[in-house]
UniProtKB/Swiss-Prot annotation:
Belongs to the universal ribosomal protein uL24 family. Keywords: Ribonucleoprotein, Ribosomal protein, RNA-binding, rRNA-binding. It holds the Pfam family KOW. GO terms for biological process: translation. It comes from the Bacteria. SMART domains: KOW. GO terms for molecular function: rRNA binding; structural constituent of ribosome. HAMAP family: Ribosomal_uL24_B. Part of the 50S ribosomal subunit. This is Large ribosomal subunit protein uL24.
């Protein structure tokens, strides 16, 4: 199945503690059906001190399920569903079903 959410996409969180927040996808994990989004779903982790890194409590992004994310419409930034379209030159591109604008390409 084609990927509806890709690295670098602007997404909106649909449910959970960070509902309504937007961020950029840092990493997609298709086997786990999860993604890392910059600035969303932050958790505190205790880090042991090493020669290169300082110890202490740090905040980092935790993975969030893809079903809780929606791609942001390029036109107005609101959540939209994603469709696929084949252009005249044969490329398969994603488009926002809300506005019809192309997401990539």
């Amino acid at each position: 199945m084609a990927a509806k959410v890709k690295k670098g996409d602007k997404v909106v969180v649909l449910t959970g503690r960070d509902k309504g927040r937007t961020g950029e996808v840092i990493q997609v994990m298709p086997k786990e059906n999860r993604a890392l989004v910059r600035g969303v779903n932050l958790v505190k982790r205790h880090q042991r001190q090493t020669q290169t890194q300082e110890g202490g409590i740090i905040s980092k992004e935790a993975a969030i399920d893809l079903s809780n994310l929606a791609v942001a419409d390029p036109k107005d930034g609101k959540p939209t569903r994603v469709g696929f379209r084949i252009l005249e030159d044969g490329r398969k591109v994603r488009f926002a079903k809300r506005s019809g604008d192309l997401i990539d390409g």
